[in-house]
Amino acid sequence: MNRQLRRVALAAAVLIPVSLLAAAPSASAANDGTTSLATVLKAGQAKFDQNDKDFDILTKAVEAVLANKPNSPVKVLADGNTALTAFIPTDRAFKNLASALSNKTVKTEAGAFKVVAGLGIDTVESVLLYHVVPGATILSGDALKANGAKLKTALDGKVIRVRVTNAPAIILGDYAPKLANPRVNLDQVDINKGNKQVAHGINAVLLPIAP
Protein backbone atom coordinates (compact mmCIF):
# COMPACT_ATOMS: atom_id res chain seq x y z
CA MET A 1 0.00 0.00 0.00
CA ASN A 2 1.34 3.45 -0.96
CA ARG A 3 2.57 5.24 2.18
CA GLN A 4 0.98 8.51 1.18
CA LEU A 5 -2.32 6.76 0.67
CA ARG A 6 -2.05 5.25 4.13
CA ARG A 7 -1.64 8.72 5.56
CA VAL A 8 -4.99 9.70 4.08
CA ALA A 9 -6.67 7.61 6.77
CA LEU A 10 -4.86 9.27 9.68
CA ALA A 11 -7.87 11.29 10.73
CA ALA A 12 -9.40 11.71 14.16
CA ALA A 13 -12.50 12.85 15.96
CA VAL A 14 -13.64 13.46 19.49
CA LEU A 15 -16.77 11.38 19.94
CA ILE A 16 -19.35 10.20 22.47
CA PRO A 17 -22.62 8.30 22.05
CA VAL A 18 -25.78 10.41 22.20
CA SER A 19 -26.98 8.19 25.06
CA LEU A 20 -24.02 9.26 27.16
CA LEU A 21 -24.71 12.90 26.39
CA ALA A 22 -28.22 12.49 27.72
CA ALA A 23 -26.73 11.31 30.99
CA ALA A 24 -24.76 14.54 31.37
CA PRO A 25 -27.21 17.47 31.42
CA SER A 26 -24.74 19.75 33.17
CA ALA A 27 -22.39 19.49 30.20
CA SER A 28 -25.20 20.33 27.77
CA ALA A 29 -26.22 23.36 29.82
CA ALA A 30 -22.71 24.74 29.48
CA ASN A 31 -22.93 24.72 25.67
CA ASP A 32 -25.84 27.02 24.95
CA GLY A 33 -24.01 29.62 22.85
CA THR A 34 -25.13 30.05 19.25
CA THR A 35 -21.89 31.06 17.52
CA SER A 36 -21.68 28.83 14.45
CA LEU A 37 -18.63 26.97 13.25
CA ALA A 38 -18.86 28.86 9.96
CA THR A 39 -18.33 32.05 11.95
CA VAL A 40 -15.36 30.62 13.83
CA LEU A 41 -13.81 29.31 10.61
CA LYS A 42 -14.34 32.72 9.00
CA ALA A 43 -16.31 31.41 6.06
CA GLY A 44 -16.06 33.91 3.25
CA GLN A 45 -12.75 35.25 4.54
CA ALA A 46 -10.42 32.24 4.45
CA LYS A 47 -7.14 32.71 2.60
CA PHE A 48 -4.51 30.17 1.67
CA ASP A 49 -1.29 30.59 3.66
CA GLN A 50 1.75 28.68 4.94
CA ASN A 51 0.14 27.41 8.15
CA ASP A 52 -0.44 23.67 7.82
CA LYS A 53 -2.28 23.48 11.13
CA ASP A 54 -5.28 25.66 10.37
CA PHE A 55 -8.37 24.98 8.28
CA ASP A 56 -8.31 27.16 5.16
CA ILE A 57 -8.85 24.32 2.70
CA LEU A 58 -11.77 22.95 4.68
CA THR A 59 -13.36 26.39 4.82
CA LYS A 60 -12.88 26.87 1.08
CA ALA A 61 -14.46 23.47 0.48
CA VAL A 62 -17.51 24.44 2.54
CA GLU A 63 -17.76 27.71 0.60
CA ALA A 64 -17.52 25.87 -2.72
CA VAL A 65 -20.29 23.43 -1.83
CA LEU A 66 -22.65 26.16 -0.67
CA ALA A 67 -21.91 28.32 -3.71
CA ASN A 68 -22.92 25.45 -5.99
CA LYS A 69 -25.62 23.92 -3.80
CA PRO A 70 -27.10 26.62 -1.53
CA ASN A 71 -29.52 24.15 0.05
CA SER A 72 -26.88 21.53 0.82
CA PRO A 73 -27.04 20.00 4.31
CA VAL A 74 -23.55 21.43 4.74
CA LYS A 75 -25.25 24.76 5.47
CA VAL A 76 -25.96 23.49 8.99
CA LEU A 77 -22.43 24.60 9.84
CA ALA A 78 -23.71 28.17 9.61
CA ASP A 79 -26.70 27.57 11.88
CA GLY A 80 -25.47 28.15 15.41
CA ASN A 81 -28.80 27.07 16.88
CA THR A 82 -28.25 23.50 15.69
CA ALA A 83 -26.10 21.33 17.93
CA LEU A 84 -23.41 19.31 16.20
CA THR A 85 -19.82 18.18 16.41
CA ALA A 86 -17.56 18.55 13.38
CA PHE A 87 -14.20 16.92 12.86
CA ILE A 88 -12.18 19.33 10.78
CA PRO A 89 -9.09 18.23 8.84
CA THR A 90 -6.10 20.54 8.92
CA ASP A 91 -4.56 21.93 5.77
CA ARG A 92 -1.78 19.36 6.12
CA ALA A 93 -4.44 16.63 6.10
CA PHE A 94 -5.81 17.89 2.80
CA LYS A 95 -2.31 18.20 1.33
CA ASN A 96 -1.69 14.55 2.20
CA LEU A 97 -4.96 13.55 0.57
CA ALA A 98 -4.24 15.59 -2.54
CA SER A 99 -0.76 14.09 -2.79
CA ALA A 100 -2.17 10.57 -2.57
CA LEU A 101 -4.83 11.26 -5.17
CA SER A 102 -2.47 12.89 -7.64
CA ASN A 103 0.52 10.59 -7.04
CA LYS A 104 2.78 13.57 -6.51
CA THR A 105 3.66 15.82 -3.62
CA VAL A 106 1.28 18.75 -3.31
CA LYS A 107 3.05 21.53 -1.43
CA THR A 108 0.58 24.40 -1.41
CA GLU A 109 -2.89 24.86 -0.01
CA ALA A 110 -4.11 26.22 -3.32
CA GLY A 111 -2.77 23.14 -5.08
CA ALA A 112 -4.42 20.80 -2.60
CA PHE A 113 -7.74 22.58 -2.93
CA LYS A 114 -7.56 22.29 -6.72
CA VAL A 115 -7.09 18.52 -6.48
CA VAL A 116 -9.90 18.10 -3.96
CA ALA A 117 -12.28 20.34 -5.92
CA GLY A 118 -11.50 18.27 -9.00
CA LEU A 119 -13.29 15.33 -7.38
CA GLY A 120 -16.57 17.08 -8.08
CA ILE A 121 -18.85 19.09 -5.85
CA ASP A 122 -21.04 16.11 -4.89
CA THR A 123 -18.03 14.13 -3.68
CA VAL A 124 -16.70 17.10 -1.73
CA GLU A 125 -20.13 17.53 -0.16
CA SER A 126 -20.25 13.87 0.88
CA VAL A 127 -16.80 13.99 2.43
CA LEU A 128 -17.69 17.12 4.41
CA LEU A 129 -20.92 15.58 5.70
CA TYR A 130 -19.02 12.51 6.86
CA HIS A 131 -17.11 14.78 9.24
CA VAL A 132 -20.27 16.02 10.98
CA VAL A 133 -22.12 14.31 13.82
CA PRO A 134 -25.47 16.10 14.19
CA GLY A 135 -27.49 16.52 17.34
CA ALA A 136 -24.76 16.44 19.98
CA THR A 137 -22.19 18.88 21.36
CA ILE A 138 -19.32 16.51 22.10
CA LEU A 139 -16.39 17.73 24.18
CA SER A 140 -13.02 16.03 24.50
CA GLY A 141 -13.49 15.00 28.12
CA ASP A 142 -16.57 13.00 27.18
CA ALA A 143 -14.85 11.56 24.15
CA LEU A 144 -12.19 9.91 26.25
CA LYS A 145 -14.98 7.90 27.91
CA ALA A 146 -16.56 6.83 24.62
CA ASN A 147 -14.66 3.63 23.85
CA GLY A 148 -16.77 1.40 21.63
CA ALA A 149 -19.12 4.13 20.46
CA LYS A 150 -20.60 4.17 16.97
CA LEU A 151 -21.63 7.61 15.82
CA LYS A 152 -24.05 8.27 12.98
CA THR A 153 -22.80 11.07 10.77
CA ALA A 154 -24.69 13.47 8.52
CA LEU A 155 -23.80 11.34 5.48
CA ASP A 156 -26.56 8.83 4.67
CA GLY A 157 -26.33 7.05 8.01
CA LYS A 158 -22.60 6.39 7.70
CA VAL A 159 -20.98 5.81 11.07
CA ILE A 160 -17.62 6.36 12.71
CA ARG A 161 -16.43 3.70 15.16
CA VAL A 162 -14.51 4.89 18.21
CA ARG A 163 -11.73 3.21 20.17
CA VAL A 164 -10.00 4.90 23.09
CA THR A 165 -6.62 3.71 24.36
CA ASN A 166 -4.71 4.41 27.55
CA ALA A 167 -2.09 6.55 25.77
CA PRO A 168 -4.49 8.44 25.68
CA ALA A 169 -5.52 8.28 22.07
CA ILE A 170 -8.85 8.33 20.29
CA ILE A 171 -8.80 6.06 17.27
CA LEU A 172 -11.50 5.93 14.62
CA GLY A 173 -12.69 3.35 12.17
CA ASP A 174 -14.07 4.69 8.90
CA TYR A 175 -14.73 2.98 5.55
CA ALA A 176 -11.14 2.41 4.48
CA PRO A 177 -10.31 -0.85 6.32
CA LYS A 178 -6.98 -1.42 4.57
CA LEU A 179 -5.61 1.92 5.73
CA ALA A 180 -4.23 2.91 9.10
CA ASN A 181 -6.86 3.91 11.64
CA PRO A 182 -7.41 7.65 12.19
CA ARG A 183 -6.41 9.46 15.39
CA VAL A 184 -7.47 12.68 17.07
CA ASN A 185 -5.28 15.78 17.27
CA LEU A 186 -5.34 16.19 21.03
CA ASP A 187 -3.96 19.72 20.78
CA GLN A 188 -6.88 20.87 18.61
CA VAL A 189 -9.97 19.88 20.55
CA ASP A 190 -13.01 21.80 21.81
CA ILE A 191 -12.91 24.55 19.18
CA ASN A 192 -15.86 26.90 19.81
CA LYS A 193 -16.41 25.46 23.30
CA GLY A 194 -19.38 26.98 25.09
CA ASN A 195 -21.52 26.89 21.98
CA LYS A 196 -23.88 24.31 20.54
CA GLN A 197 -21.49 23.67 17.65
CA VAL A 198 -17.98 22.45 18.47
CA ALA A 199 -15.14 21.14 16.36
CA HIS A 200 -12.01 19.09 16.82
CA GLY A 201 -9.03 19.29 14.51
CA ILE A 202 -8.00 16.05 12.84
CA ASN A 203 -4.77 15.10 11.14
CA ALA A 204 -6.23 13.58 7.97
CA VAL A 205 -9.42 13.39 5.99
CA LEU A 206 -11.95 10.77 7.11
CA LEU A 207 -12.96 8.46 4.27
CA PRO A 208 -16.62 7.46 3.79
CA ILE A 209 -15.58 4.95 1.09
CA ALA A 210 -12.51 2.83 0.48
CA PRO A 211 -10.03 4.56 -1.87
What residues fall within each predicted segment?
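Mature, structured domains of secreted/extracytosolic soluble proteins
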Residues: 2-211
